[in-house]
Design a protein with these regions (language model features):
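Extended alpha-helical scaffold regions
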Residues: 1-206
Length: 206
């Protein structure tokens, strides 16, 4: 993670600037693997918090927390505004990869978990639950559930009561586990009408 000068590795700083789709997917898989372990998760968090100044007219770096949560917010707005909104398959794959990095970092580092949870601009739980409530593909819903579940990881003295309370409140409001306005719980509806139909159960397994 670090070079001889104890700064973020130049290789990683170079890698996170990649713009090619296949390389971006591979990068996210690599970061999720490298982030396993508490200290490694802290390093990964530092890398994703690092916002290098982009040259004028160039795209923002893909792999930053701010990009991830802005991306999630974009699709929340798109799906809430248009019920027939569609997420391009390649973007769904990238977002699932990014959520995998988030889940790994949050699972292994209590300090990072608390920092992200408390970040008002990111509002991770609110945004993840809001996207989960949209009509997105089940494979993406499963990735969202795994990322949210990572915030409830038991470490040391246990999971943070603040985070557990926020998770439960968001879960309750999402309609995933209880009826809302007479409609069946979202998780039950998706199991019966989507997963059973296709013979695949990513959301249930998550």
């Amino acid at each position: 993670w670090q070079g001889p000068d104890r700064r973020i590795s130049r290789f990683l700083l170079w890698a996170v600037d990649t713009r090619e789709l296949g390389q971006q997917r591979a990068l996210l898989g690599m970061l999720a693997s490298l982030a396993e372990g508490e200290q490694c998760a802290v390093y990964a968090h530092a890398l994703l918090e690092h916002e290098a100044a982009a040259p004028t007219g160039s795209e923002r770096r893909l792999v930053t927390w701010s990009h991830l949560f802005d991306w999630v917010a974009h699709y929340i707005e798109a799906f809430q505004r248009h019920t027939v909104a569609v997420m391009p398959p390649e973007e769904m794959l990238l977002l699932r990869g990014f959520l995998g990095v988030l889940a790994t970092v949050v699972r292994y580092s209590p300090a990072t978990r608390d920092a992200l949870f408390s970040h008002k601009a990111y509002a991770p739980l609110e945004r993840l639950f809001a996207l989960y409530a949209c009509a997105v593909p089940m494979d993406l819903k499963a990735a969202l559930l795994r990322a949210m579940a990572a915030f409830a990881t038991q470490t040391g003295t246990g999971a943070s009561p603040r985070i557990l309370s926020a998770l439960w409140d968001n879960l309750d409001q999402s309609g995933a586990i209880r009826s809302v306005r007479g409609e069946p719980p979202r998780a039950l509806y998706e199991l019966e009408h989507i997963e059973c139909v296709h013979g695949r159960y990513p959301g249930t397994h998550a």
